[in-house]
Amino acid sequence: MKIFNKDGNKNSKEDTKAGAENSEAQNSGSSAEEVNKARENPEEASASSEAEKSPEVKCQEEKQVLMEKYYRLAADFDNFKKRTARQMEENRKAVLEQVLLDFVEVTDNFDRALKSAKTAEDMSSIVSGIEQLSRQFFSILEKYGLEKIESEKASEFDPHRHEAVHHIETSEVPDNTIVDVYKTGYALNSKVIRPAMVSVARNPDEAEK
């Protein structure tokens, strides 16, 4: 009987040890299985992790993402403004350069005309040269959109394009028409930049009315 009890105790210890080993193996297998599942389905694992986060943590993370987007957009917009400003300045300089080059040609012709005028014996040739320079000069102005405002005598007075310097009583031209032009007016791309200075007719009969 003592021998039986001794063997029985021994068997009981072995059974306990075996049970513990089986339990540990099962836990280890379960952990390994979870790791494998996480590797095979990272999206599900991530979703599970997200679900475990508190609303406060989620809110902070979303705020951080939005702030990073804001800073990137602000930096991009700032760079865009700088590029646009540089491009506008380069365009302005290019246009100014072309305008000046056009007028340099007129300056060269003025210099030649002055040299010729000093030795010219015929005044008509000097006048002809000045007229040619005037045409060349204004052709450059027209190239950049400048035009003279129509201000012929007896043409109708337009308060949007003319400025009345004097009113003259006369019957030679219709009432409220231009009598004389004191200064030519100009428009740039159809916009009046300087109205023509003119005198305007007032017929005596109309004035009495």
From Swiss-Prot:
Compositional bias per record (Polar residues), positions renumbered to this chain: 23-33
Keyword Transcription regulation: no
Region (Disordered): 1-60
A Pfam entry, by short name: GrpE
Location relative to the cell: Cytoplasm
GO molecular function: adenyl-nucleotide exchange factor activity; protein homodimerization activity; protein-folding chaperone binding; unfolded protein binding
Biased composition (Basic and acidic residues): 1-18, 50-60
Main location, first listed in the record: cytoplasm
GO cellular component: cytoplasm
InterPro entries: GrpE, GrpE_coiled_coil, GrpE_head
KW Cell cycle (keyword) present: no
Keywords: Chaperone, Cytoplasm, Stress response
Swiss-Prot/TrEMBL GO biological process terms: protein folding
Subunit: Homodimer.
NCBIfam families linked: PRK14153.1 (NF010750)
Family per similarity comment: Belongs to the GrpE family.
Function: Participates actively in the response to hyperosmotic and heat shock by preventing the aggregation of stress-denatured proteins, in association with DnaK and GrpE. It is the nucleotide exchange factor for DnaK and may function as a thermosensor. Unfolded proteins bind initially to DnaJ; upon interaction with the DnaJ-bound protein, DnaK hydrolyzes its bound ATP, resulting in the formation of a stable complex. GrpE releases ADP from DnaK; ATP binding to DnaK triggers the release of the substrate protein, thus completing the reaction cycle.
PANTHER family listed in its UniProt record: GRPE PROTEIN (PTHR21237), GRPE PROTEIN HOMOLOG, MITOCHONDRIAL (PTHR21237:SF23)
Annotated protein name in UniProt: Protein GrpE
Gene: grpE
